[in-house]
Amino acid sequence: MPEPGYTVVALAGGSLEPDFRAAGYTAVNKAYLPIKGAPMLERVLRAFRGARSVGRIRVVTQPAAFAAAFGERANALADDVIAPGGGLIDSMLAGFAGLAPDQRVLVSATDLALLTPSSIDVFTARADEVAKDADIGYGFVSRHVHDAKYPHVRHTWVHLHEGVFCGAGISMLRAGSVAQTADLLRRVAALRKSPLRLAMLFSPSTWLRMLTGSARIAELEARADEMSGLRCRGVLCDVPELAVNVDRLADLRMVETLLH
């Protein structure tokens, strides 16, 4: 039986990028970078803990690193700490292990330094509205809303018939869908920073329509359904904090300034 509320799978594996190491940071990975005196991961997990729509929280990270960083606070931040796999999708599979197939899960990056409980609840309300029966609900944010608040934040923008968008750092998945489509997810993850190459994975005609900005959200959803055998929907959620992530040293400096 699914548990009440959304289960969170927060991904905090991997190693620290050279950009941060060159600046003298020694954190295990960017999730553990300090922001205002606390690891960024703590800010993210506290946001999930404060969200009304969230039940259980799982964090996929090295258990020893998590225990060393948080000590007695660890149990308050996460219900389960799970060792990561060899890559993004393997880590997702580890985080989903043992969940009921129909459990609704929020998969989240852990470099969303501006994440708040209310932004999470807005996303889940939107997912409940437009992707209630979906297996996968991909979060995305429109550029005009994002740039109105954070005009200097860089993103990979995708031009569609309905507007210009970037991906959010949170998406919704039904737990049973991950194992069913793991191979496809690996291919998508490898291309996620290159929208046109990702479009070619969908089909040459999709690539052409993406190139000209004429592809529609509904046709991308339909093609994703065909490729995966699942029900895939886009979850447009105009909360820009869901898309502000810390990829580079400049991003870290920016969010430190915003949170000052």
Which positions does each model-derived feature cover?
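Conserved N-terminal catalytic core of the sugar/cofactor nucleotidyltransferase
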Residues: 2-9, 39-104, 213-217
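Short beta-strand/turn micro-motifs composed of small residues
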Residues: 12, 61-63, 109, 140
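Short beta-strand-to-loop acidic/aromatic patch adjacent to the donor-nucleotide binding site
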Residues: 102-113
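Conserved active-site beta-strand element of glycosyltransferases/polysaccharide synthases
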Residues: 233-235, 245
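Short, conserved phosphate/pyrophosphate- and ester-handling motifs at nucleotide-, phospho-/glycolipid
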Residues: 248
